């Protein structure tokens, strides 16, 4: 449940910005009526000057640039691993410490290039012999091994060996 809340918390500013862009671009009131046009007066004849409402509207290009800059700033900050607590407010109790650490790893790992992550794994200190999935020799040894035979019975002192007929 917390994960869904965090996803909603991250994506909600982008949804509000998209709604504002849509309202400014099409003159719609998206918040009420789910995209249906607001009750606007009928269009004026072509000879009349444009209304003040249209001429005072914010340019979509300026808003797009602002949104792009904000998105780049957030992505850069997360990718650089800077203090993510300043971007998102998290409780700082001991119970949530591990959740916060895994949250940071999740976002940073999705933003890093695959080659960097692969090199990071390759340079770590775990035993590669146990984990090496590309080792074809171990596959050959597994599939070409001989089945184990049961141990041969040894006669006890003073007894004859049993012979099967």
Swiss-Prot record:
<keyword id="KW-0372">Hormone</keyword>
<feature type="glycosylation site" description="O-linked (Ara...) hydroxyproline">
    <location>
        <position position="42"/>
    </location>
</feature>
<feature type="modified residue" description="4-hydroxyproline">
    <location>
        <position position="150"/>
    </location>
</feature>
<keyword id="KW-0964">Secreted</keyword>
<feature type="modified residue" description="4-hydroxyproline">
    <location>
        <position position="151"/>
    </location>
</feature>
<dbReference type="GO" id="GO:0006952">
    <property type="term" value="P:defense response"/>
</dbReference>
<feature type="modified residue" description="4-hydroxyproline">
    <location>
        <position position="43"/>
    </location>
</feature>
<dbReference type="GO" id="GO:0005179">
    <property type="term" value="F:hormone activity"/>
</dbReference>
<feature type="glycosylation site" description="O-linked (Ara...) hydroxyproline">
    <location>
        <position position="153"/>
    </location>
</feature>
<keyword id="KW-0325">Glycoprotein</keyword>
<feature type="propeptide">
    <location>
        <begin position="162"/>
        <end position="165"/>
    </location>
</feature>
<feature type="glycosylation site" description="O-linked (Ara...) hydroxyproline">
    <location>
        <position position="43"/>
    </location>
</feature>
<feature type="signal peptide">
    <location>
        <begin position="1"/>
        <end position="18"/>
    </location>
</feature>
<keyword id="KW-0732">Signal</keyword>
<feature type="modified residue" description="4-hydroxyproline">
    <location>
        <position position="50"/>
    </location>
</feature>
<protein>
    <recommendedName>
        <fullName>Hydroxyproline-rich systemin A</fullName>
    </recommendedName>
</protein>
<feature type="modified residue" description="4-hydroxyproline">
    <location>
        <position position="49"/>
    </location>
</feature>
<feature type="propeptide">
    <location>
        <begin position="54"/>
        <end position="143"/>
    </location>
</feature>
<feature type="region of interest" description="Disordered">
    <location>
        <begin position="142"/>
        <end position="165"/>
    </location>
</feature>
<feature type="glycosylation site" description="O-linked (Ara...) hydroxyproline">
    <location>
        <position position="150"/>
    </location>
</feature>
<keyword id="KW-0611">Plant defense</keyword>
<feature type="glycosylation site" description="O-linked (Ara...) hydroxyproline">
    <location>
        <position position="45"/>
    </location>
</feature>
<dbReference type="GO" id="GO:0005576">
    <property type="term" value="C:extracellular region"/>
</dbReference>
<keyword id="KW-0379">Hydroxylation</keyword>
<feature type="glycosylation site" description="O-linked (Ara...) hydroxyproline">
    <location>
        <position position="50"/>
    </location>
</feature>
<feature type="modified residue" description="4-hydroxyproline">
    <location>
        <position position="153"/>
    </location>
</feature>
<feature type="glycosylation site" description="O-linked (Ara...) hydroxyproline">
    <location>
        <position position="151"/>
    </location>
</feature>
<feature type="region of interest" description="Disordered">
    <location>
        <begin position="33"/>
        <end position="70"/>
    </location>
</feature>
<feature type="propeptide">
    <location>
        <begin position="19"/>
        <end position="35"/>
    </location>
</feature>
<feature type="modified residue" description="4-hydroxyproline">
    <location>
        <position position="42"/>
    </location>
</feature>
<comment type="function">
    <text>Activates a lipid-based signal transduction pathway in which linolenic acid is converted to jasmonic acid, a potent activator of defense gene transcription, including proteinase inhibitors.</text>
</comment>
<feature type="modified residue" description="4-hydroxyproline">
    <location>
        <position position="45"/>
    </location>
</feature>
<feature type="glycosylation site" description="O-linked (Ara...) hydroxyproline">
    <location>
        <position position="49"/>
    </location>
</feature>
């Amino acid at each position: 449940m917390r994960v869904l809340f965090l996803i909603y918390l991250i994506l909600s500013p982008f949804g509000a910005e998209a709604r504002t862009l849509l309202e400014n671009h099409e003159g719609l009131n998206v918040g009420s009526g789910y995209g249906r046009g607001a009750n606007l007066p009928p269009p004026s004849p072509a000879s009349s000057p444009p209304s003040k409402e249209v001429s005072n509207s914010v340019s979509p290009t300026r808003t797009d640039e602002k949104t792009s800059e904000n998105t780049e700033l957030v992505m850069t900050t997360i990718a650089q691993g800077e203090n993510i607590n300043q971007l998102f407010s998290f409780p700082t109790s001991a119970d949530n410490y591990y959740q916060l650490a895994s949250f940071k790893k999740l976002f940073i790992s999705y933003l890093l290039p695959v080659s960097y992550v692969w090199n990071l794994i390759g340079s770590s200190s775990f035993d590669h012999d146990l984990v090496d999935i590309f080792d074809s020799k171990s596959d050959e040894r597994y599939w070409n091994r001989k089945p184990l035979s049961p141990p041969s019975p040894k006669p006890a002192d003073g007894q004859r060996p049993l012979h099967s007929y």
